[in-house]
Amino acid sequence: MDWLLLANRVLDGADITDDEALAILNCPDDELLLLLQGAYRIRKTYYGNKVKLNMIMNAKSGLCPENCGYCSQSSISTAPIPTYKMVNKETILQGAKRAYEAKIGTYCIVASGRGPSDKEIDIVVSAVKEIKETYGLKVCACLGILKPEQALRLKEAGVDRYNHNINTSKEHHPHITTSHTYDDRVRTVETVKEAGMSPCSGVIIGMKETKQDVIAMARSLKALDADSIPVNFLHAIDGTPLEGTKELNPRYCLKVLALFRYINPTKEIRISGGREVNLRSLQPLGLYAANSIFVGDYLTTAGQEKHADFQMLEDLGFDIDFAPASYAR
């Protein structure tokens, strides 16, 4: 396969075929750098050498009634994680201050559970208004399944983006959870779009899905027109049904990132949870396909030290995309 020719076709507006998508996932290791060169050509066209940085605030941990097999916060998990109800506004603001001082442009407020209560929405709305006035950061919320009126309140408060992952393909979804459907997740993404927020939706790779499932995920997100696509790589946690699952290697993870770039050329693609344990020493190469990362810790697992991420970006010669609103103090 001529990967640069394929990249040029994508830049000319063509969609890759299923055979070409499968060829990306089956790319011989000795062609991997050529594949990434093609992905980088696409990435650079739309994003240059800039990298978007995101930080997570785990605003509510554990206590979730859902039965997602990958998640340490689910009702069926026995993982020893911190559990607490929604934090107060001041705690959310403290996290935003840390993000601003670290030059992290997007602050992500995440809460466990099937969906937020109106009281939890009240806390987030109050915090977001002050974050916007004080720091001018972009704010992403991830609170579960939303009612239309809740989505409108978040939009009016200043939430820029709302995350609700599809996680896997529609066909594989029943193998991951039975407490909600794939269509439930899609409806929430549509609710977000209807409210005027930017839709963020992504996947988790390494949950015993097939390569055809991975291709279906990338195409589904294209059809949903998700502006931001977090690509997680399973960090199997003891005490979850997927405990001990180890299907991934760093080279395959890079091929997955390339696939998402070839299929979703104009979108923000973020290397998300599991980056450190799955890409390992090949983490820097991932940014030739992706243009965004999380900095700091994830929900219940530790991330790489911030200074190591900033050093990685400096070594790559990439620039941090940090442009808070001009009215921030």
UniProtKB/Swiss-Prot annotation:
Reaction(s) catalysed (UniProt annotation)? (4R,5S)-dethiobiotin + (sulfur carrier)-SH + 2 reduced [2Fe-2S]-[ferredoxin] + 2 S-adenosyl-L-methionine = (sulfur carrier)-H + biotin + 2 5'-deoxyadenosine + 2 L-methionine + 2 oxidized [2Fe-2S]-[ferredoxin]
A GO biological-process term = biotin biosynthetic process
Q: Which GO terms describe its molecular function?
A: 2 iron, 2 sulfur cluster binding; 4 iron, 4 sulfur cluster binding; biotin synthase activity; iron ion binding
SMART domains in the record, alphabetically?
Answer: BATS, Elp3
Tell me the cofactors it needs. [4Fe-4S] cluster; [2Fe-2S] cluster
Radical SAM core domain: residues covered: 46-275
- Membrane-crossing ranges are none
* One Pfam family cited in the UniProt record for this chain: Radical_SAM
Q: What does the cofactor section's free text say about binding?
A: Binds 1 [4Fe-4S] cluster. The cluster is coordinated with 3 cysteines and an exchangeable S-adenosyl-L-methionine.
In which pathway does this enzyme or protein participate?
A: Cofactor biosynthesis; biotin biosynthesis; biotin from 7,8-diaminononanoate: step 2/2
Q: Which family does this protein fall into?
A: Belongs to the radical SAM superfamily. Biotin synthase family.
Relate the assembly described in the record: Homodimer.
Q: How is this protein named in the record? A: Biotin synthase
Q: Which organism is it from?
A: Anoxybacillus flavithermus (strain DSM 21510 / WK1)
